[in-house]
């Protein structure tokens, strides 16, 4: 359709321009991603838009917030060997994690460049559409932790298609508790009392 054709042209132009700008500034240009939107019938009438943050590695451990549109160098794809069949269902999440192990980051293009049609069998329609997605995502995350030399257990998050890494605690690291407080003495006293009476961790400081 003409609408789809316009989207393709805008994708190519906007991403190409972003890559050139990154190169001019001397910044990495190996991996870029954009915002996206979901639609049911007409691409001109999106239901909801996903406006994403700039590169957030901790957030990516919780969910595949990058999703679409993603652009990366062909050489990186070939170096990684493409997608892994064992992560089918969450192959994009797995690929992004492996790409970022090489690039160290990704550039966010803050424009809606991808439009995803929602239907009953798609992952955009809800996590229940493909139950095996969660298992694949947890494998992708667990493998990523192993490759990056970190230890922890990947668990389901509070919401569908979200995950939590329960990190292994090595030794007794010091925990710094920052309490933003101004002219609220009673609230501060309650907070401090709660910390001192409920925590089981002894090595901490309150700032």
Each PLM stretch: what is its role?
Residues 1-8:
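Short, small-residue-biased leader/transition segments that mark boundaries at the very start
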Residues 10-47, 119:
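Conserved donor NDP-sugar-binding/catalytic core segment of glycosyltransferases
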Residues 45-75, 87-88:
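A recurrent flexible, glycine/aromatic-enriched loop bordering the glycosyltransferase active site
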Residues 81-97, 132:
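Donor nucleotide-sugar recognition loop
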Residues 179-190, 201:
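Active-site beta-to-alpha loop of glycosyltransferases that engages the nucleotide-sugar donor
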Residues 193-203:
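Short, acidic, metal-binding catalytic loop of nucleotide-sugar glycosyltransferases
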């Amino acid at each position: 359709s003409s609408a789809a054709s316009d989207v393709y042209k805008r994708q190519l132009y906007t991403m190409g321009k972003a890559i050139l700008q990154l190169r001019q500034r001397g910044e990495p240009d190996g991996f870029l991603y954009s915002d996206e939107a979901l639609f049911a019938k007409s691409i001109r009438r999106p239901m909801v838009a996903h406006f994403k943050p700039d590169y957030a590695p901790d957030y990516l451990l919780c969910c595949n917030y990058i999703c679409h549109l993603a652009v990366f160098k062909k050489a990186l794809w070939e170096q990684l060997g493409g997608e892994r069949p064992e992560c089918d269902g969450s192959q994009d999440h797995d690929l992004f994690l492996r790409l970022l192990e090489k690039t160290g980051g990704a550039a966010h293009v803050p424009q809606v460049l991808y439009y995803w049609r929602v239907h009953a069998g798609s992952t955009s329609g809800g996590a229940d559409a493909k139950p095996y997605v969660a298992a694949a995502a947890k494998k992708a995350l667990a493998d990523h932790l192993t490759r990056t030399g970190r230890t922890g257990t990947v668990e389901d998050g509070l919401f569908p298609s979200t995950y939590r890494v329960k990190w292994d605690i090595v030794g007794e690291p010091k925990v710094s508790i920052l309490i933003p407080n101004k002219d609220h003495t009673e609230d501060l006293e309650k907070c401090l009392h709660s910390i001192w009476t409920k925590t089981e961790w002894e090595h901490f400081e309150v700032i």
